[in-house]
A protein has these predicted regions:
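ATP/NTP phosphate-donor binding region
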Residues: 1-93, 350-351
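Short glycine/serine/threonine-rich phosphate/pyrophosphate-binding segments
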Residues: 23-26, 48-51, 76, 101-107, ...
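A glycine/threonine-rich phosphate-anchoring loop and its flanking beta-alpha core
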Residues: 24, 115-218, 311-312, 316
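Short Gly/Thr/Asp-enriched flexible loops that form oxyanion-binding sites at enzyme active sites
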Residues: 52-55, 82-83, 102-116, 155-156
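Active-site segments that bind and position negatively charged phosphate/pyrophosphate groups
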Residues: 210-336
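C-terminal charged capping/lid subdomain of soluble metabolic enzymes
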Residues: 320-395
Length: 395
């Protein structure tokens, strides 16, 4: 046994506030930071809800404007609209409220403002490795108030879709990381069950792919294994129970989402994520749903490549793991995850999600490009293998 060697990159996240009723701390958080002109970003559904009134009420006079046009997969046009609104009120901060779409919309718009250029035009369809360039060094504080489990609020990377090609790219910069995250499970009670579950599967996918990444670390393995265990225990109960019980389970799911992606900029994510990044915008499939579809197949693929790294996954799933029979245990983990997904009313195949089989080869190249740039798989993954995995996930 040798001593651990490496390095760990921390983001600029400063505070995570969690628990029922904690949205009421938002005003004090803005005051503490001296922020007076915050723009809140959300989608059309939450934009019509009383929950938005609760959030803006907590902000008080510090709410300068509300943008309610965030949309799935972050179309570049919505980013430009938000950027214009933030410039109009000379925003000093942005509050994202909802799931991954408003969170990423806020990040990419912030990138446009901080760099004095349209950040959507330079987004790259890879692993978000290209840092945002330029700007005058100023800050634009982002506070995230998530209502799903996609966990994008824990990274400084934001995805955006080019509407002309339906290819998703992204931007990354330490300044894009939300500085404060407020996890109030009460705000998730109106999240549709299918969306809550699907984003929970996205968190599960984060944890699984962090563990078998070649960039995995002891810290990320430990937290990812705990995330898996928490999701297995609490995700089903979170939608089957009501009232205080549901809040308890939802709060544990929010902790799982946090743990699943802790250190994600160190581990990065692999084949399932790369597929999801392109399946989503191409066929308008929510990213949580893409994880429901691709994760078990990619786990079986990785069982042949890196079975020795499935130990923490097995721990989280309650599967007996023996290094002498690692591949069999890894395959059992994949089966266990597929069975777990099957209990929920979400699409389980690409066919169920409305994907056109004859179009599958069209995304092989951008998926391959992301995998190659991420460099988290032990060996190269070729286009034929990508297409074979997508075909397996079709039905």
């Amino acid at each position: 046994m040798s001593a651990p060697v490496g390095e760990f990159f921390f983001t600029q996240l400063e505070k995570v506030i969690f628990g029922p009723g904690k949205i009421e701390t938002l005003g004090k958080e803005l005051e503490r930071r001296g922020l007076k002109r915050a723009v809140i970003v959300t989608g059309k559904t939450l934009g019509k809800s009383k929950l938005l009134d609760r959030v803006t009420g907590a902000m008080g006079a510090r709410c300068a404007a509300a943008y309610k046009g965030a949309a799935q997969h972050v179309p570049s046009a919505t980013v430009r609209e938000l950027t214009a609104e933030m410039k109009r009120v000379d925003a000093d901060s942005v509050i994202s409220f909802g799931g991954g779409s408003p969170i990423d919309t806020a990040k990419v718009a912030a990138a446009s403002i901080l760099t004095n250029r349209d950040a959507t035009s330079g987004a790259r369809g890879i692993d978000f490795a290209g840092a945002v360039k330029g700007g005058d060094g100023r800050e634009l504080i982002h506070i995230a108030v998530p209502t799903t489990l996609s966990a994008g609020e824990y990274t400084p990377a934001g995805g955006v879709t080019d509407e002309s090609t339906l290819i998703k790219g992204g931007v990354v910069d330490p300044r894009l990381q939300p500085r404060t995250i407020i996890n109030d499970p009460a705000l998730s009670l109106e999240t549709p069950d299918w969306l809550w579950v699907a984003t929970g599967m996205r968190a599960l996918d984060h944890a699984v792919e962090a563990i078998y990444s070649i960039r995995h670390q002891m810290l990320t393995d430990t937290l990812a294994a705990k995330a898996i265990a928490l999701l297995i225990e609490h995700l089903p109960a979170s939608i089957k129970t009501k009232g205080e019980q549901s809040l308890d389970h939802r709060g544990h799911c929010q902790m799982a989402a946090w743990f699943s992606i802790f250190g994600g900029m160190n581990t990065r994510f692999g084949v399932s994520h790369a597929m999801g990044h392109q399946i989503g915008p191409k066929w308008d499939v929510p990213h949580g749903v893409t994880s429901c579809i691709t994760m078990p197949h990619v786990m079986r693929f990785m069982a042949d490549i890196a079975p020795q790294r499935f130990g923490p996954i097995a721990e989280g799933l309650g599967v007996k793991f023996d290094m002498g029979n690692a591949r069999a245990a890894a395959l059992e983990c994949a089966d266990r995850v597929q069975t777990f997904i099957a209990q929920f009313d979400v699409p389980h195949t690409l066919k169920d999600a409305g994907v056109k089989r004859n179009e599958i080869p069209e995304i092989a190249e951008p998926v391959h490009s992301e995998i190659e740039h991420a460099k988290v798989v032990d060996r190269p993954v070729n286009r034929e293998e990508i297409i074979a995995l997508l075909e397996a996930a079709y039905q």
